[in-house]
Amino acid sequence: MRKIETKKLAAAVTALALCAGVLTGCGGAASGTASSTAASSASSEASSEGADEMAAKNVADLIDAIYVQERNEDTDAQCEAAKAAWDALTDTQKELVEGENADPDYFGRDTGDASKDDARNQDDIGDNELLVVSFGTSFNDSRVKDIKGIEDALQAAYPDWSVRRAFTAQIIINHVQARDGEKIDNMQQAMDRAVENGVKNLVVQPTHLMHGAEYDEMMEMIDTYRDKFESVAVAEPLLGEVGSDATIINQDKEDVAKAVTAAAVKEAGYDSLDAAAADKVAFVFMGHGTSHTAKVSYSQM
């Protein structure tokens, strides 16, 4: 009887040992599967991040290629390629765009509705053209309000003349074209357009502040085309002629100084400069600055 019980006990112990082995084996398999899954997930995530970075770098390189560039035969295609590549990115990838000059704001920043602007690059100019030349801005709302506002005012004042536009900053032209599809003429394009349209009388009105580098470059371009027209006239920039030293202040500078001061006083909520002075209010006017000899204009102002 005791032999039978001993055999039963031995059988039970053996069965338990076998079950334990099976259970241990199952647990090991589960652990291995979990580790494998985690490794696979990490690898997939790393691969995805690498793909995101590569896509973002591609766009950054395309932006850098057009950011500061003299216009050439590839500019139009490069602008289109950069925008198409940007549009194909995910939101996550767009945040990763970073290059020498490139960043997410190049395409991603909302500066207003470009459709409200008018590039004024149409043909059918006629005999008389009034070319408004500006440095330019890539901020759509500002361009519509300021530059287009000036152009529209000139067109209303001189209805017998065709008002056209040119920007002197190719960096701005490329940005607006790539982001918004709006093609604005640079100086050479605008002058070529005038010649091709048979313009006889050309008046150039710059919106530049002073006789700086941009104004000088504009004049150099105009001089190469003077013999293509019957007459060419170029207006002064806003602050007029520079003057030989800080003590020589022309009427243009005096008029501008009075105008901006009056605007600042009004914006601050005062009826007069004296009223602002009584409240010990000071107005500070800030300029961009320049290494050009025209920097004396700031002292004159």
Question: Where are the language model's segments positioned?
Answer:
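Post-signal peptide N-terminal segment of mature Sec-exported envelope proteins
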Residues: A34-M54
